[in-house]
Amino acid sequence: MAQPGTLNLNNEVVKMRKEVKRIRVLVIRKLVRSVGRLKSKKGTEDALLKNQRRAQRLLEEIHAMKELKPDMVTKSALGDDINFEKICKKPDSTATERAIARLAVHPLLKKKIDVLKAAVQAFKEARQNVTEVESSKNASEDNHSKNTLYSNDNGSNLQREGTVISEQEVKETKILAKKPIHNSKEKIAKMEHGPKAVTIANSPSKPSEKDSVISLESQKTPADPKLKTLSQTKKNKESDSSLSGNSDGGEELCEEEKEYFDDSTEERFYKQSSMSEDSDSGDDFFIGKVRRTRKKESSCHSSVKEQKRLEKVFLKEDTGETHGDTRNDKTKPSTETRKLESVFFHSLSGSKSSRRNFKEQAPKTRSLDFPQNEPQFKNQFNKKLSRRLENTKQQLQLPLHPSWEASRRRKEQQSNIAVFQGKKITFDD
């Protein structure tokens, strides 16, 4: 902080050089005039000698002022309060001292020096205030750092206490959680031991029950052979009735297929195909119907085959077990097989006949419909040709572009150029 103050003061001293030089010139002029007045005065010899001594001293001051440097004048003026009268009355005062005092006392220079002195004083006071403020700031920072350290210590202590308390709580909760787990394990073990004993006690009783059931069954079987044969015949009758019901269901499905596949739909389809030009889409539609009927037929056949196999198995069992009622049993399966065969072959014959009818009807209808449509196609083709010819004629009648016309004329002229009819000139001529 001291260097900028001194630098500023030195700068001010440098700025004062011009003022000092200007004031020095003014003072020298004044002194020259006073020297001339003193030499021109007349009087007694003592007065003349006195005036000569004064004039000599003024000349010495003038020469000293010329040799003085302006910085020296300003520094001496700023340093001490100069009193010109005191310095002149001193017998030992030199010409340079008197010259400096005379320049410093000049009113113009005195004003500037007073301003500089006030600035220096203000700078010193500001410097003292800055040091005081810095010292106060340092003291406050020290106090703040001490407070923060104290607060941090308190916070760390509180955190440690909180962590210790939380750890204790966690340990207590773990201990409490372990106790019910052990209790539950003991209860489960007790429960497991109880049912095991019960099962061990009950298990010996099971084989005795099984033995009793077997003995009862063995007692029942030799006593009632007739009842067994009757029960088997009843079972066979029930199975036959279920098979007949299934066969009736198969007949109903085949009848539904027949209703779904009527001749009226075929006739309508072929009429539509004969009227429309795109017959492929109709064929695809009808082929889709045929595929659906095939899927249903295949499902019917599979169900009927399974029924037939079951019937054969039941028939074998009946023939092996019952010898007394063979005639009745033979009559019943024969009728059932006839029914099954009739249902089975009827569905197949019906589907085949429907397919044959479809194959036979389709070419007939097409052979009948296409000759009727032939004149219509011819008329349409003729109309299209006539329209194209009319369009080409209209295009030819339209005016050509001028560039096309010019090229056409040029070609005509080139084709019409007459052959050269003059004499050929040779070098001999």
UniProtKB/Swiss-Prot annotation:
Region listing for Disordered, in residue ranges: 128-285, 311-429
Record PTM N-acetylalanine, positions in chain: A2
Modified residues (Phosphoserine): S203, S205, S264, S279, S281, S349, S351, S367
GO terms of biological process kind: maturation of SSU-rRNA
Name of the encoding gene: SRFBP1
Compositional bias ranges of the Polar residues kind: 128-138, 146-160, 373-383
One Pfam match: BUD22
Coiled-coil annotated spans: 42-67, 108-144
Cross-link annotation Glycyl lysine isopeptide (Lys-Gly) (interchain with G-Cter in SUMO2), location: K190, K316
Biased composition (Acidic residues): 249-265
Record text on subunit structure and interactions: Interacts with SRF. Forms complexes with SRF and SRF cofactors ARID2, MYOCD and NKX2-5. Interacts with the N-terminus of SLC2A4.
Domain of life: Eukaryota
InterPro entries with a match to the protein in the record: Bud22/SRFB1, Bud22_dom
Keywords: Acetylation, Coiled coil, Cytoplasm, Isopeptide bond, Phosphoprotein, Transcription, Transcription regulation, Ubl conjugation
Function of the protein: May be involved in regulating transcriptional activation of cardiac genes during the aging process. May play a role in biosynthesis and/or processing of SLC2A4 in adipose cells.
Name of the protein in its database record: Serum response factor-binding protein 1
A GO-annotated cellular component: nucleus
Ranges annotated as biased composition (Basic and acidic residues): 183-195, 311-341, 357-367
Cellular compartment(s): Cytoplasm, Perinuclear region
Keyword Methyltransferase listed: no
